[in-house]
């Protein structure tokens, strides 16, 4: 929950106050400037007393919407007739999440038991690891290590603040995936037909990079480029199965992908919004053939 109670009752006769200091507490991991970057008011700013509560409530929502904290309190401390300090107290969430991974290759548990005798060879297992605040700058690292029926070794690192103005960010990711079963075409009833093998029949590796720009609180732009290499077993493109799997007689497909995303967002709570809006535009181009 978020404490919405301000600890000071402001006198009506004060028309305007200057923000002398912003005092932040509770941020054991998160850098102070990451919190200050999200606030709608800064040190040295002048705020009308009639607008102070609304300004602090807005700052509280913006800090909470970083998803770095489970509780945020923002309150004023009157110093004199001209100055006010703003007290920001946060409680950090748990940032490290190792999650076990277990997946059946089949559509249901009953199919796995009845058709494949609950064979462990039909299982994919591993771990997904995420750290949402590695250096205290809201940078995120995700790792996936999966083996078994499917194989997935991938990582992604997001650094949302890479310049002094804290407005630009970058993301880098890469991965290697394999599977022992793929859908190679549909039958006359539009049912998927699958090609299976004890060995891996499809392999894929990719690398992706993106640049994001957030010059204003509400607006974010993201530019992404990625490259993918996909290879299927030669049997998949044989006359028996689907010689035009990639719309060619090749068992390999390489392609680039470019995308641009523009997003405007202003909500009271990014996880459970009750009021506000989010609008986005996505332009994407896959392949240049």
Please provide the spans of the model-predicted regions.
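Periplasmic polypeptide-binding modules associated with outer-membrane biogenesis and secretion
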Residues: 1-110, 128, 142-161, 280
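C-terminal transmembrane beta-barrel domains of outer membrane proteins
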Residues: 38-39, 277-289
């Amino acid at each position: 929950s978020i404490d919405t109670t301000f600890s000071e009752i402001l006198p009506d006769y004060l028309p305007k106050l200057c923000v002398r200091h912003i005092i932040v507490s509770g941020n054991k991991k998160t850098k102070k400037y990451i919190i200050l970057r999200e606030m709608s008011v800064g040190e040295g700013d002048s705020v009308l007393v009639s607008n102070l509560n609304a300004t602090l409530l807005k700052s509280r929502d913006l800090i909470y919407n970083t998803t770095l904290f489970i509780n945020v309190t923002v309150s004023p401390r009157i110093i004199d007739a001209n100055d006010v300090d703003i007290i920001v107290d946060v409680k950090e969430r748990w940032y490290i999440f190792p999650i076990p991974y277990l997946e059946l290759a089949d559509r249901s548990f009953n199919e796995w038991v009845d058709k494949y005798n609950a064979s462990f060879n039909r299982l994919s297992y591993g771990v997904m690891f995420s750290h949402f605040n590695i250096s205290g700058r809201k940078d995120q690292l995700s790792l996936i290590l999966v083996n078994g029926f499917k194989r997935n070794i991938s990582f992604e690192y997001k650094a949302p603040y890479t310049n002094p103005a804290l407005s630009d960010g970058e993301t880098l990711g890469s991965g290697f995936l394999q599977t022992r079963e793929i859908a190679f075409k549909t039958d006359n009833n539009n049912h998927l037909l699958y090609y299976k093998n004890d060995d891996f029949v499809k392999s894929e590796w990719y690398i992706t990079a993106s640049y994001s720009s957030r010059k204003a609180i509400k607006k974010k732009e993201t530019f992404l480029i990625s490259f993918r290499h996909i290879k299927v077993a030669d049997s998949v493109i044989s006359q028996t199965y689907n010689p035009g799997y990639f719309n060619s007689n090749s068992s390999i497909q390489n392609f680039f992908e470019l995308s641009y995303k523009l997003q405007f967002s202003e909500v009271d709570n990014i996880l459970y919004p009750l009021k506000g809006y989010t609008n986005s535009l996505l332009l994407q181009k896959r392949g240049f053939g």
